[in-house]
Swiss-Prot record:
The modification N-acetylserine is found at residue 2. Dimer of identical or non-identical chains of three types (A, B, C), which are coded by 3 separate genes at different loci. One of its GO terms (biological process) is lipid metabolic process. This is Alcohol dehydrogenase 1. Keywords: Acetylation, Cytoplasm, Metal-binding, NAD, Oxidoreductase, Zinc. GO terms for cellular component: cytosol; mitochondrion. Disulfide bonds: none annotated.
Amino acid sequence: MSTAGKVIKCKAAVLWEPHKPFTIEDIEVAPPKAHEVRIKMVATGVCRSDDHAVSGSLFTPLPAVLGHEGAGIVESIGEGVTCVKPGDKVIPLFSPQCGKCRICKHPESNLCCQTKNLTQPKGALLDGTSRFSCRGKPIHHFISTSTFSQYTVVDDIAVAKIDAAAPLDKVCLIGCGFSTGYGSAVQVAKVTPGSTCAVFGLGGVGLSVVIGCKTAGAAKIIAVDINKDKFAKAKELGATDCINPQDYTKPIQEVLQEMTDGGVDFSFEVIGRLDTMTSALLSCHSACGVSVIVGVPPSAQSLSVNPMSLLLGRTWKGAIFGGFKSKDAVPKLVADFMAKKFPLEPLITHVLPFEKINEAFDLLRAGKSIRTVLTF
């Protein structure tokens, strides 16, 4: 029996308050309005940014259905939707691409002017309303996606059709973590063959930076982390050296400068700490180095830096979603994965049923997982 045009009752993980566990609730998901798409979720990754929302360091209105790194199948579409049809495999996009605004038309940027849910989260779709309700009350959306639900509704500028043969429990990582890291290397920094790179932080995103540096042909990839247990995986994915700052008495940037004849060509901060952002900047060569901020810093914090750190020729950059224009890039990234141009499987350390979402967050907080994928 078709569910198109009808309210769907399903299970979702609802966060009612900050610092509290998710609760699995019976919710109602309204049909998509014009230019909206309702998706039956198949798999979703658990990302550190979701945990930032739980802790309150990343503001989002509550109660909400979180999750932003998922993949699923289109259940129904609203009036005017032409980019997907029911039955298509898709990835929701937390960084939309309208294709019409000034930024979408700019060749060097990817932050669509409709990305208000990232910069000024309202917890709603573009029309300002929610499609979720629970116990008779509206439930907020989360950055255009809300993948912690058996069904979700997104705007049609926030969804990408992908290869019908793609394994959704793998390519869901392309919805955030992998693309953010990989793109920071190949799209934002534009790592060059034979170059030297330093990657600060070896979580799922940091390891994806390592994959990007290797794919781009870097000759030396130095992985930096205080957890030595992460070094084996980093080397498996392409790191040539692994160092722990706690093993040295001098600042880590000085260690890296000595290892690389004055500094690396490219450095990446994938932790979200202000002190390591400065260390990453100073670890790249003062005359030609490029440093990329990848990690999301805590809200309402600012960074001070000596202008001389930049005046001689360093470049300091940052980007959301690896600098990729989402609707254009996601199908290509999925195709590249299918063509075995890069791996995703080594990033997935745990696969759990959706109902065990709180266990997945426990693994994340304990540093015991790289990526946990929840399946519906």
